[in-house]
Each structure stands twice: as C-alpha cells, then as structure tokens.
Amino acid sequence: MVAGAGLNDRGVVEFVVERAPAAIARLQALGVPFATEGDALHLTREGGHSHRRIVHVADATGWAVQEALLNAARAHPNITLVPDQVAIDLATSRHEERYSGAGHVWGVYAVDRTTGLVDLHTARATVLATGGAGRTYLFSTAPKGATGDGIAMAWRAGCRVSNMEFMQFHPTCLYDLQVKNFLITEAVRGEGGRLVNPTTGKNFMPYYDPRLELAPRDVVARAIDAEIKRYGLDYVHLDISHMPADFVREHFPNIHEKLLGLGIDMTRSPIPVVPAQHYTCGGIVVDRDGRTDLPGLYAAGECTQSGLHGANRLASNSLLECFVFGEAAAAHIARRWDDLPPPPPVRPWDESRVADSDEEVVIKQNWTEIRRFMWNYVGIVRTTKRLERAANRIAMMTEEVADYYGHFRVTPDLIELRNLLQTADLIVRSALHRKESRGLHYTLDHPDMLADAVDTILVPSHF
C-alpha cells in the first residue's frame, strides 16, 4: 500500500494476498522447484519490502515458472497451443455477419508468421494475457513481443484503460552495449548489494532515501538517474563483492555465470548498471474476476489495471498477479460456461483492397524513432513540454502508419508498430492528465503529490 502511493485498491490487495499461498502451492504441484531452507520455502527480500516474503528459484524464477506452465499446457488434453500467431485485433459484434450491436467479443484475428495468412479464432470467452508495453522504450528489460498488443486491441474494441502514466523503470539493468536487456535482479540489493558512484567511489543512496538500496524501485531509479546526469556518467556500480564469494555464487548462479562470460566477476568487481523500463503498471480496467468492459472479454497480468499495484508495483508481485487473476478469470468462465452464448457467424479478414508492402523502411524508421523519443521525453523524469513534444510526434506518426496500414497487407512488424503507437499515445495522454507527481510518474512541473489519490481513466471516444 505504501509503494502504490495511495492508488491501490485495498480490497484487491487483500484479495490477491489471501490467494497467494494457494497460487504458490499450485505452482509447486506443476513442478516449479522453489528454493527451500530445511522443510520450508526459502524467502528472500527485495526493494520496498519490509520482510523476507518472496519465494524464488535461485535467480531465475520467471524462467522456471514459464517452463513449468508451458510443459503443463503441452501435456493437458484439453489445451491446443497454436504457435506463431500474431494478434491483429479483437473480433467483436462489429465484425458479425449480421451486426447485433451487443458489444460482445467473439475472438481474435491473427496473422500466421509462417504463411502470412490471417486466421480468425472464435470463442465464447477470450482472455488477454499479452503482457505490457515495455518495448515502447529504447531501453527495456521486456521481451521483444512486449509491444502493448492486448492493451491496444482492447482500447480499439472499446475498453477503458487506466493509469498508463505509471511505467516502472527497473533500477539495475546491466550496462553493456552488446548485451541488452539483461536484468540484475532486485535480490542482489536485498542481499547486501550497494549502489556506488564510480567517480566518487561513494555509496549514494543515503543521500536519497533512508531505506537505502531497499527503497521502492521508483526512488532508486530516480536516484541513479540523478547521479548519472549530475556527474555525466554512462552507468553506476552495483557492488556485492564485499559479501563472501560462495554466498554470491550460491544465491545468484545464473547472473554470476552470465557476467563471467562478459568478463565481470561479481564476487570481485562491481557491476555497471543503468535503469531500464521494466513494467507497465496501468492497462485494461478489470474487476476481481478478470472481466473487462466488454462481454466475453477477460484479461489478466501486466496488460491490466486491476487495482493491485497503484502508482508503483512492489517487487515480485507481477507473477503473483498473473496467477491469481488467471485463476479468477478461468473460474468465472467455468461457472458461467452454459450461459455464455456461442459465437455467431463472424466475417473473415478482408484483404481485397491491399497489396504487398514496398516500403518496409517506413516501419523500421518509425519503430526506432518512437522508442527513442519515448525514452527521452516520457522517461523517469518528465516535464509538460517534453510530453507535449511526444504527443505531437505520436499524432504525426499515427496518421502515417494508419495510411500504411490501410494500403498494405499486415505483417507482424506492422502490427507491433501500430500497437506501439497506440500504447505510446495512451501513456502520454495519461501523463499529461496527471497534474502531480505520484509513484512512478514524476514531473518537474508538478513535483508535489496531491491530497486525493485518483486513478487516471481513459474512455474510448470512438464508441
């Protein structure tokens, strides 16, 4: 509640916390090998937490959970995985052969990466679990597909979107021009790592926050950003070399091995780090059952704004949110299955008036440009003038990409660029709407936090 700066929904926070033990137990049953200490789970501590309460798999928890879930899905007789599909847009009542006006979501149009053809996947219920919009920024720890696809599709279909101004920047991403997006886990600071200015040789966090390296991510990221700008640095140092070497190797085996391959021995030398975009705290408005504004459409995870995180996500709560709301959405669909109407006839994708692209340079140019100006103008520290500059560029590029989209066949790169622009627009509009600094949104023009904590809610005007 403290990290969320007053915007958390207390009921949702309690809802998630109460269901955490069951979610962890289910993951164990699916084969996630959480670290143990004796007969109990080993608990670690990360930024913003007052106690050790985080279960983990060494320093590769996300990978271990992903592998377990994928293996379980592949083995389940009622689950059919359809790989290499890139979603274009939701199929709604507007796409019915006989328009009903019900506003229902009936599935999704997706292009097959292998064939280039557009498929229509229909269903009684559709769940968006598409992740965040990290690739909107030049530097991000997010995977390549994190282009805000679910958020953009839901917005275009008619869903409200909330709190998109709250983009979390992880304080410690490895600074290496050849190896991008390698995250140095928060647990390194939790287990004693110190942030040091390489010019002065001093640990600088005491000058910024009494919680030192364990302050919330927004505080630590702004502190690092301030040191970099004040001293003209490319990076700062994260140093855990004062801890026993065996302790470091045991707690961070994957990071240790990766860094050794890059010529850095973290048991002897500091790690060069910089902040990078890490998590999208805003998204599609959902309730505790994962329901969106549209009948038949559910969402879970980073693409949503559930009320759990507020203005800043507490470390390691993202996976928990996925499990709890994924279960909640599935349970709600199962309970209501007999009441969910089957999909009516839906029109296939129409490519009759488009041609193959002969201007791929447009996509590459805009892709690079948008990520660069979002980093420079809509980053860790903002101003109204920078946000307005970003808004002007987004408007110009949106018109250009819309013209391109209307004349050429869809490709995965074009789909992602279109969604990047849409989510960038939502981020900037939300940031301009908030006339205060709160949590992850820090603006020099409004540095104080207002007394009333109010969500930013954007409502589609095209409906």
Model-flagged regions — what are they?
Residues 26, 32-52, 196-213, 224-227, ...:
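Glycine- and aromatic-enriched mobile tails/lids
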Residues 89-115, 120, 264-308:
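FAD-site-proximal beta/loop scaffold in flavoenzymes
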Residues 28-117, 122-124, 129, 173-176:
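Conserved redox-cofactor binding core of oxidoreductases
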Residues 34-37, 81-84, 120-122, 128-129, ...:
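General beta-strand structural signal in soluble alpha/beta enzymes
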Residues 125-179, 215, 229-230, 317-328:
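Glycine-rich loop(s) and the adjacent beta-strand/alpha-helix scaffold that form part
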Residues 1-16:
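Glycine-rich active-site loop/strand segments that organize a redox cofactor
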Residues 11, 57-60, 114, 118, ...:
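Alpha-helix capping and helix-loop boundary segments enriched in small/acidic/polar residues
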Residues 153, 159-271, 332-339:
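An anion/pyrophosphate-binding glycine-rich loop and adjacent beta-alpha core
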